């Protein structure tokens, strides 16, 4: 693990997505400081979450909140979301819930959320799935212990 500033990490991810022409915006970001994490692993988790967001929706929004205890990184989209009863299932390896979302936008093998959840656990955290209050689709929140 390295000492990383979450603002810098998100700036790098935003630059990469914008170079790729993807509709990803930066939402609310709060808290300052650095924390120990594996930047390549966290970037991979966020790339997976952004990829899912853009597969099922047309836009995504990234945000973070850093506190004394945790870093919360959220990826929200405007897609159909995942029904609450199926969210736990969606975190399992090879889970494909395309019929719950949009069968025309599948194509993954069902590992993106599972990998992100594993990366969260390796940082003493968790991946939470919910509904985006603003965009209406899925909100995937990577919570990493500080």
Language-model features: where?
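A residue-level detector for a conserved hydrophobic packing site
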Residues: 42-43
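Acidic ATP/Mg2+-coordinating residue in the GHKL
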Residues: 77
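Short beta-strand/loop element within the Bergerat-fold HATPase_c
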Residues: 59-69
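Short conserved segment of the HATPase_c
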Residues: 82-96
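Conserved micro-motifs of the catalytic ATP-binding
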Residues: 34-37
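Short alpha-helical Gxxx[C/S/T] motif in the catalytic ATP-binding
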Residues: 49, 112, 116
């Amino acid at each position: 693990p390295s000492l990383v500033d979450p603002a810098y990490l998100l700036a790098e991810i935003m630059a990469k997505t914008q170079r790729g022409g993807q509709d990803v915006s930066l939402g609310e970001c709060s808290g300052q400081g650095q924390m120990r994490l594996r930047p390549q692993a966290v970037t991979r988790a966020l790339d997976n979450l952004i990829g899912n967001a853009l597969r099922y929706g047309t836009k995504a929004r990234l945000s973070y909140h850093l506190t004394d205890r945790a870093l919360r990184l959220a990826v929200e989209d405007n897609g159909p979301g995942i029904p609450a009863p199926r969210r736990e299932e969606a975190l399992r390896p090879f889970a494909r819930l395309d019929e719950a979302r949009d069968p025309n936008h599948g194509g993954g093998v069902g590992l993106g959320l599972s990998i992100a959840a594993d990366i969260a656990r390796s940082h003493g955290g968790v991946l939470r799935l919910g509904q985006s209050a603003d965009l209406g689709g899925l909100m995937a929140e990577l919570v990493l212990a500080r």
